[in-house]
């Protein structure tokens, strides 16, 4: 563990050897106002190895640890009297993200969560826990500024369209469907309350689920998983005589890093849970 000697935000990265985690490590190492203090990953064969050497990144003395709990405890003690509090960035797995986030809050460390798959009940539990602990916690389904703008546009347009379909496409290593980003988009559309996609005919499906998953509001969501994709979302709205399509493509994980760094810098100003990058940038 490294003790922060400057006025920088101490950052722990959980899932540090993964695709997103390694990008976060690189961005933190190259940031002037953040400092990497712990790199946690479940890959046991790399335990104790230097993170910079493993990922061929800017020099750092941080060693990979398999022990999230131990890292949280140690960093919490190291910075208990510091004005700038540590932040845990989590890009792990839907099966572990809830416990990881809860543990960080328990140790007084603000979580910035990019892992999707949290249920509404889990998010509500974390919100209550964060508020009681007086700790900022950010649940961010998508760190792309472009995606946030898509969601804002879709939310505004929903007032004018009764028929809306959402398509989300990701690489075939993504575990959860639909994506947290797409769920967030649907929730923002549903802020204008009405029943969407009311059928004018009696529909039948010769292949079950071919029309996609249907939310209580009537919004249809279609999930695609293919090699060669990264992260893509399309919102298609239709009315007589026209369609309106909003599309966002992420072609490199670097697109997420400005949003991640913004969340790291700002979450310390909050004392409760926030959901969505728009809460930080607008």
From Swiss-Prot:
It is found in: Cytoplasm. Gene3D superfamilies: Dihydrodipicolinate Reductase, domain 2, NAD(P)-binding Rossmann-like Domain. GO terms for biological process: diaminopimelate biosynthetic process; lysine biosynthetic process via diaminopimelate. One of its GO terms (molecular function) is 4-hydroxy-tetrahydrodipicolinate reductase. Its EC number is 1.17.1.8. NAD(+) binds at residues 15-20, 114-116. It comes from Prochlorococcus marinus subsp. pastoris (strain CCMP1986 / NIES-2087 / MED4). This is 4-hydroxy-tetrahydrodipicolinate reductase. One of its GO terms (cellular component) is cytosol.
